[in-house]
Amino acid sequence: MSGNTFGTLFTVTTFGESHGPAIGCVIDGCPPGMVLSEVDIQPELDRRKPGTSRHVTQRQESDTVEILSGVYQGKTTGTPIALLIRNEDQRSKDYGNITETFRPGHADYTYWHKYGIRDPRGGGRSSARLTAPVVGAGAIAKKWLFEKYGTTFKGCMSQLGDIEIPFEDWRHVTENPFFSANASILPQLEAYMDDLRKNGDSCGARIDVVAENVPVGLGEPIYDKLDAEIAFALMGINAVKGVEIGAGFKSVAQKGTEHGDELTPEGFATNHSGGILGGISTGQNITASIAIKPTSSIRTARHSIDKAGNPVMVETLGRHDPCVGIRATPIAESMLALVLMDHALRHRAQCGDVVVTPPPIPGSR
């Protein structure tokens, strides 16, 4: 396999390039009989699409999704579901100056040495544009998980560059382009991004995601641990350089008396584990965070080399997100949903008949 397919029972294969005619995915393993149309998918794509504020790329894409297969009379058939999103606003001429050079921090150099050929237009296959079909597939997973278990997903930006964003309330997330759960800090975030753009620079971000009402028992005990699969999936998002589950790296400074989530008849007392123990879901909220590096394509000239190994200065002229993390929240939610969907089907296949008494205790949120 060449790494274009994700999942075991619920699989997603993406295709396309940033400046090709279209991008999309083929989803296999979706159970039959679920009511599904483009209306169920489009709102998630609209959360991610470019051109929604001055702080993201100004490439104008409607990201209108088309369902090509796998749905009949408004319901899934159990056969592969193909989603297509047509590219509408490519401007390939902006990349003429980097066809023979490598952008520092980008996949140009590694794609060239791996394949011996690369598509420089918008980064080709390595572009974050390819996260759109992932969000489309994630919308299907979210719908099935909600209808089956009541599982829901939410996320927010908790840090932009060196600015930490204290959590206030989830209701703020839908009210601003940063997916910030803090309304009072928005002027500071806007000023920071305006300054970055003016100086031709970029920054990173931290995104937190949560899955609620996750059933107990998802995940495998050794090599396909649920937290390992979540980390694998989240690391597959463009520009992600770090993943935390639950308390994550804060666990290093915690004592065992603090980190271990105590159990009572009324439920778990805390949730430092992030809702996963021994690679298997506890029924608590699953919590994860990702660290996203600064965007590699910037207008400031940087030292690099060309294909012949000669020193050059590289300046990227295309339309780019000065912070990829601003639009990453729905992407991270979708990847988490895809993992849980896959493991829900795997758990149902092997352990669907298992009955344990007493029932699971409530989880600390």
Swiss-Prot record:
Signal peptide: none annotated. Pathway: Metabolic intermediate biosynthesis; chorismate biosynthesis; chorismate from D-erythrose 4-phosphate and phosphoenolpyruvate: step 7/7. It is an enzyme of class 4 (lyase). Its EC number is 4.2.3.5. This is Chorismate synthase. The gene is aroC. It comes from Janthinobacterium sp. (strain Marseille). NADP(+) binds at R48, R54. NCBIfam families: aroC, PRK05382.1.
